[in-house]
Curated annotation (Swiss-Prot):
EC number: 5.4.2.10
UniProt protein name: Phosphoglucosamine mutase
Source organism per UniProt: Finegoldia magna (strain ATCC 29328 / DSM 20472 / WAL 2508) (Peptostreptococcus magnus)
Entries under Gene3D superfamilies matching the protein: Alpha-D-Glucose-1,6-Bisphosphate, subunit A, domain 3, Alpha-D-phosphohexomutase, C-terminal domain
UniProt cofactor(s): Mg(2+)
Post-translational modification comment from the UniProt entry: Activated by phosphorylation.
Family: Belongs to the phosphohexose mutase family.
Entry-linked Pfam families: PGM_PMM_I (PF02878), PGM_PMM_II (PF02879), PGM_PMM_III (PF02880), PGM_PMM_IV (PF00408)
Organism taxonomic ancestry: Bacteria, Bacillati, Bacillota, Tissierellia, Tissierellales
Length: 449
């Protein structure tokens, strides 16, 4: 990670960490790196946060001052921006969103002209120019100044594209949706109504401050309760910017990203459509998923945590399905990033075609309990633990004890002064005890350094 860019763009408290001055400088820096492109067009979308308008105005000022035109897409999911960047042949796309974070946070994320996240090397070059604006030796005046256009067809274009990616009729199927007061609030209900589902919707009346508040993909109990109350056949919950999906079966049981990937993997394998006989997950992927797919001869390729790393592995080796437990699920033949609505209609399509209830698909794997605790350490010590013999000995003892029925994963947080401790196994109470012991040991050893 750099000075400004994290693993998913630039993010922080709007007006404090992420200021209009930074947004303006970022826009100019990125445009300067793109100054030689033929099509000087940039598309911008945003979620429902109150600070979105403020940051959008700053970005547009910077972009147009560099001679680039802007298509304003309005409130629209992140994956829609990735798709529409390609559709409009734009030189890049910008999303203003902080995903699942509270409303006071916001973020700015760029997509390349192909709809992929920017390479680390390009982000580093942009960061340099943010801090060295005097090196942007480009002055635009007169008719060369950029223009701004309201792209009113953007939402319908994206809706029609998603509908074209499935062969699905949900007549007679009850579907519940939790839109988390976010970017899917208008689009998701339209899509499921177009698919003839009997739709029950909650959390769509956004006000700029209620995004993700006690709802959405990080609060799955909401969709579970809605499915039970409405007696729905399936439920889908999205995060603020619409790139995550958490599903729910007809009994109210949650299907996280691992369970969804498991269901998709089984279906593709059974229908001889799973390229390279593997799916892509991360080091946090539940052992239950690995065991379930192994039984049918499917491998799980693991990357470091982050959907960008999952995508890199998929592109590099030709895998077509991958994702994270958190609900980032990538169907690379359909879009270049995680797409919550796409994942939902794909899962519904599999249920209809296989004539299965979601509960049957959910039961294809049994999740091993996972305990996650955070050891608080100073940032300068976040990587020192790797060389500590006492910590490594404790980890080795636990891993030997678990063998193939559990594991220990230690990783430093990319954004906070924390070391995350995850232990996975069969006994929840035992795992909690061992996780706290290891957390305390890490904190103690880091204090001694």
């Amino acid at each position: 990670m750099g000075k400004y860019f994290g693993t998913d763009g630039i993010r922080g408290v709007a007006g404090e960490d992420l200021t209009v001055e930074l947004a303006y400088k970022l826009a100019r820096a990125a445009c300067y790196k793109l100054k030689d492109v033929d099509n000087k067009l940039i598309v911008i979308g945003k979620d429902t946060r109150i600070s979105g308008d403020m940051l959008e105005a700053a970005l547009i000022s910077g972009i147009t001052s560099m001679g680039f035109d802007v298509y304003r897409l309005g409130v629209i999911p992140t994956p829609a921006v990735a798709y529409l960047t390609r559709f409009y042949n734009a030189c890049c796309g910008i999303v203003i969103s902080a995903s699942h974070n509270p409303y006071e946070f916001n973020g700015i994320k760029y997509f390349s002209n192909e709809g992929f996240k920017l390479k680390d090397s390009l982000e580093e070059e942009i960061e340099y120019l943010i801090d060295h604006q005097d090196e942007i030796d480009l002055k635009v005046t007169g008719e060369k100044v950029g223009r701004v256009y309201e792209e009113e067809c953007a939402r319908d274009t994206y809706i029609n594209y998603l509908l074209s990616r499935v062969d699905l009729d949900l007549t007679g199927v009850k579907v519940s949706l939790d839109c988390g007061y976010g970017a899917t609030s208008e689009i998701a209900p339209i899509i499921f109504n177009r698919l003839n589902a009997d739709v029950t919707v909650t959390n769509t009346e956004y006000d700029g401050k209620n995004i993700n508040f006690k709802c959405g993909s990080t609060n799955p109990e909401v969709i579970s309760n809605l499915v039970k109350i409405s007696e729905s056949d399936m439920g889908f919950s999205f995060d603020g910017d619409g790139d995550r999906l958490i599903a729910c079966d007809e009994t109210g049981e949650i299907m996280d990203g691992d369970h969804v990937i498991c269901a998709v993997g089984h279906f593709l394998k059974e229908n001889n459509k799973l390229k390279n006989n593997a799916v892509v997950g991360t080091v946090m992927t539940n052992i239950g998923l690995i065991k379930s797919l192994k039984e049918i001869g499917v491998d799980v390729i693991k990357t470091q945590v982050g959907d960008r790393y999952v995508l890199e592995e998929m592109r590099k080796n030709g895998y077509i399905i991958g994702g994270e437990q958190s609900g980032h699920i990538i169907f690379i033949e359909d879009n270049t990033t995680g797409d919550g609505i796409l994942s939902a209609i794909k899962l519904a399509e599999i249920a209809v075609k296989s004539k299965q209830k979601l509960s049957e698909m959910n039961n294809l794997m049994t999740s091993f309990p996972q305990v996650l605790v955070n050891a608080k350490v100073n940032n300068e010590y976040k990587k020192v633990y790797k060389d500590d013999e006492v910590i490594n000995q404790k980890i080795a003892e636990l891993e030997h004890e678990f063998k193939d029925e559990g594991r220990v994963l230690i990783r430093p947080s990319g954004t906070e002064p924390l070391i995350r401790v995850m232990i996975e196994g069969e006994n929840q109470e035992y795992l909690e005890k061992k996780a706290i012991e290891l957390k305390d040991l890490i904190e103690e050893r880091c204090e001694l350094i």
